[in-house]
Amino acid sequence: MLEIAVTVTARIPFQSNQIDCWRSFQSRSNAASSLRNLRSSSLATWLVAVACLGAPLGAYCQTADHSPTNPPTQNANPALSAAAVRPSAAAQQVPRLTTTVEVHGEAKDDYLPDAVAVGTLNGSTLKETPLSATVITRDLLNDQVSRLLSDVVKNDASVDDDYVPVGYYGWYEIRGFAIDMATGLEINGMTIAGEQDVPLENKERVEILKGIAGLESGVANAGGLINYVTKRPAAIKAIDLATDHRGSTYGAADVGWLLGSRKQVGARFNLGGERIASYMNDTNGWRALGAGAADWKLSPMAILKGDFEYQHKVERDGSGYQLLGGATVPDINQIYPSTMLGDQPWGPPDTYNTFNTSMRLDYTLPHNWAIFGAASYSHSLIEDNVIYAYGTPFDANGNVSCPNAPDAPAYFFCPDGSYGIYDYRDPGELRKDEVAEAILTGHVKTGPVIHDVAAGGEVFLRSVQQPGFYTMDNPYSSDGIVQDGAVYAYVGSENIYQPTAPVAIESPLQSAGPRRLWEDSHQAAAILQDRIHLPGRIQLIGGGRYDALRDHNYSGWATSPCTASPVPGPVGDPCPTTYPAPNQPNYSVVTPPNNTDQDVWLPFYAATYAPVSSVTLYGNYSELLSLGPQAAWWVDNANQFLAPYHTRQAEIGAKYEPSQRILLTTAFFRTRAPFFYPESDGAGGFEFVSQGRETHDGIEANVQGKAANWLRLTASAAAINATSDETGTPAFDGKQVINVPHLHTTVFADLTVPHVQGLHLMPGWSYSGRKEATRDDTVSVPSVNIFNLGARYTPGGEEGRVTFRIYANNIADKKYWSDTGTNTGDSFLWLGAPTTVRLSAHYTF
C-alpha cells in the first residue's frame, strides 16, 4: 500500500530590512534602462535578492534597518562551545555565546545551511568547526513532509532507532549510543524533557550533533544530542494542508509580523492540528499545537528573545516483538506491521500534554565584550496506557506456561510465539527540566595571537514524578486495588501467529498509586574556554566544564519504601531506618534512594588547520559523565541504577567546501564506554553489572548541498565497529554490540525536471546492514534496502506562492525489522513501517 504526502511551499516574503536593501540597490542604479536590463537577467536579480536576504551587505545595506533578530551591533549568530572557529577578520564585533552546541543559519535552496556551532565565538560555518554535525533544513523537512523526529533522523546514517513504538515517543541512538532522554534533546540550545514528540511546525531546522563533549552537554550519554531551532519572527502569512492514503488530515498556519518604526519588535505564531490514521490497527489519534516566538530589540546593544510551544496529543500505542525463547527471530513472513499485539477494545489511549518555553537576553558591552543570559522550562505530562505484550504467559500458580517449553525464559516470548498480555496504566507521569545559564565572552589580542575567551555558569534541574506506594505503612491498599506504582496486571495470553482474541480486563479493576517523587537531579556548572588563533590558519581550543552533580533517584523507594533485602549505598530519608508497620514484620530494611553526589571536570581539547580556504582539518578529544543505566525487573538487583560512568572520545576529520553550495565532510572517531549486561551467576540467576568495555570505532561521510544546478543532495554513510571486550563472559568478547549495524547509508536527492518549470523529482534510498539481537551475536536481523520517491511542483516556477508535494516512503512495501534495541534492560524487535504516501500543499499569502 502507498501513502502520499504533498507539501506546498511559496516564496518567503522579504522582511523590512531586506526590502530596504533591495530599494537601496534600485536607487543606486543610475539609469532606469540599466535597472530594467538588470531585472531581465535572472541570475543578477537572484544574486541581489540572495544578498538582501542575508547579513548586512557592506556597500549596499550597511545603513538599512535591521530585523529585531539581527541588530547591527552584534553578529547574526551566537557563540560558546568547544567547537572553535577562525576569528573574525575585524575583531571589533563581539559575539554572543551559548554553552550547548547549536547550529544557526539561514535556509537556502541547496539543503546546506549557512551555519555555525553554538560555542563558536563568531558565527562560523560548519566547515570551520572541529566537530561532526548534520543540519536538516526547513526545506528538507518540507520536501519529506516530516511530522516526527523519526522522519528527520533518517537523513543521518550515524543515527538509528533504538526503541520507537507506534504512537509513543521514541528513543534513538547516535554512533551506537542511546540518547539520554533527560539531557539528549534541546530547543535553541536549552535542554528539554525528552519524553515527548516535539512538534516540527515552528522549527526552522533540526541539528544532529555528534561526539558532543561534556563542555556543551554536561552530564549526558555518549554519542551526541539533537537540537531543534525555532523559527524567528518575520512578516509572513502561510497555511499548510496535508493528507495521506490512510485518511490522515492535517492543517497548520504560520503568521508573523515586524512592528515599530525600525521593525524592532517581531512576533510569530504557529497553529496546527492533525487527525492521525496509523498503519497499525487501532493506534489512531489526534493532536493540536500552538507555538509563538517574539524578538524585541531593546536598544542597539540589546535584544530579548522568547519562545513557547504547547502540544496536546492523544493516541494509542503498540508493543514490539521479542525473540522467541530468547533465541529465534519471529518469522517475518507470518506477521504484519498492521497487527497491534494484544489489541483489546477496552485499552485506553496515551495522552500527552507538553510545554516548552525559553527566554534569552543578549547584551553587547564596550571594548569587545558581550554577555548573555537565558532560562528555559520544559514540562511533559503523560497518561501512559498500553496493552503491553511481554514475555511468556503464566498459569494460575505463576509458573511459565509455554507449550512444550516449561523452562523458557520469562522475559522473552515463548518458542511457539505465545506471549503474555498486561494491562499497563501509569497516569500522571510528570517530567520537568529547568535550565538557566549566563556567559561572558571577550576578545583579547596579544601580539600575533588572538584569544576568544568565554566564561560562565549553568544550573540544570530535573524532576520526575510517577505513581508510587499507597502509604508508607501499606505499599498497596488493603483491598489490593491501589497499587504501589503503575498498574501492571496480567490479563491473558495471545500468539503472534494467530488473530487476537478478546480477554477481560482484570477484576477488580486496579488503579495506580498516588504520584511520588522518583527523581530529583541538580547540576551546577562552571564553564571556561579559550580559543587561540595562531598564524598560519591554525587554531587551538582548550576548555572544560566543572560540573557538580547531585542526582537522587527514588524510584525503588517510591514503589516499595522498605524491603526485606538490604541494598548497598547510603540510606536516605524520607524512609525510616525500621519499617513502622507492625502488621508487616517482614518489611524491616530500607530500600535507599540511589544517590549520586559527584564533582567532575569534563575537558575538551581541539585543533584546526586550514591548508587552503576550502579545506579544514581538525581533531578533538573530550570526556563525558553519564548516569548509570537501570537494571531490568528480572535480575537479582532488579530496577537498581548503576553508578555514573565516564566516556572518552577522540575524533579527527576533514571538511571540504569547493563552493558555497555544497559541503563534504568525513570523520574518524573512537568512543569508549563501560559495557553493561545481565551476568549469569551460574545458578539460573542474573545480576546487572558494568564489566569490561565497548569500543565504537567509526568512519562517517556526509555530503550536503547543491551538487549541480539541477541536483540538491543530502547523503550520509557510517561504518561503525562497536565491539565489547573483557566482559567476563567469553561469548560476548569481540562481538558487535546489539542494534548497531556495521554499515548504514542514506541518500536523498532533489532533481530538477528539464522543460517543466517548477517540477522536481525526489528519490531516496537507505541501506542498513545486519543488526545483532543478542550479545553473543548468534541471533540477528538481516540487512535491508529501502527506497523512497517524491515530487515537488510549484506552478509558475520557483517564485510561485504555492507548492504541492507528494512523498512515498518504502515504495517497494518492503517488510523488515527496523531495530533490535533495548528498553530498561529488556530487548525488543520492531517491524519497519510499510509504504506510506503523503500529500501536502503550502500557500503563502
Give the predicted meaning of each segment:
Residues 202-204, 215-292, 298-302, 355, ...:
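Outer-membrane beta-barrel translocator/receptor signature
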Residues 295-297, 431, 450-462, 517-673, ...:
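Structural signature of Gram-negative outer-membrane beta-barrels, strongest in the C-terminal barrel
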Residues 274-278, 291-297, 301-364, 368, ...:
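Acidic/polar loop-and-plug regions of large Gram-negative outer-membrane beta-barrel proteins
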Residues 97-236, 652:
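Acidic, small-polar-rich N-terminal luminal/periplasmic segments of exported/outer-membrane proteins
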Residues 536-540, 670-672, 689-774, 842-844:
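Gram-negative outer-membrane beta-barrel transporters
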Residues 2-144, 150-158:
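N-terminal Sec signal peptide and the immediately downstream disordered periplasmic leader
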Residues 48, 429, 441, 453, ...:
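Conserved C-terminal beta-signal and adjacent last beta-strands/turns
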Residues 364, 370-376, 380-386, 610-618, ...:
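Membrane-embedded beta-barrel scaffold of Gram-negative outer-membrane proteins
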